[in-house]
Amino acid sequence: MSWLVVLLILYVIWDVNYFIRCVFTVFAGRLFQRKRKVTDTTTIYGLCTSQDVDIFIRHMNNARYLRELDFARFHFYALTGLYERIRDRRGGAVQGASSVRYRRTIPIFHPYKIQTKLIWWDDKAIYLEQQFITLSDGFVRAVAMSKQNITNCNVLEVLKTYPETAQRPEKPEELKLWLDAIELSSQKLRKDK
């Protein structure tokens, strides 16, 4: 009986399902999928359930997209070994910015996949593109870009350990524009102080 009380308290205080899903996603990826190059696209699968929907119980709510992107990012780090290499240098990774474009809803009980790809990097951050694609029609329902700030180590040094990153790709045009918007926002916030 006391373990039920502890479990109930944990569910009230923490989002236990989030942590269970993180562990499951990372370990399932490591156990059942082959390692990937850091430049490869990684894929996880999901299903829009009753816990993911908006108040009208018809489609995934916007907050859940961001949560699912976390799982896909952790999976990417695990399969490519990137987080281990960052951690070996006593570094860390934190979300610096993200932008999601919602193109069409993901209806309740529809399966989907999230594809994650490293699209560019500089000395302080890596930039990922992630796409939500419904399995029934192959339509890209949402696309996200995220800036992963790498702390306490140099990204260029970390990525030198991957032969496939010897040549950095050109910065995609939409990434340039997004980074410009972030810089403008930063300048405005500095002026407001």
Swiss-Prot record:
It is found in: Secreted. Glycans are attached at N149. CDD domains: 4HBT. Residues 1-18 form the signal peptide. InterPro entries: HotDog_dom_sf (IPR029069), THEM6_lcsJ_thioesterase (IPR051490). Gene3D superfamilies: Hotdog Thioesterase. One of its GO terms (cellular component) is extracellular region. Keywords: Glycoprotein, Secreted, Signal. Belongs to the THEM6 family. This is Protein THEM6.
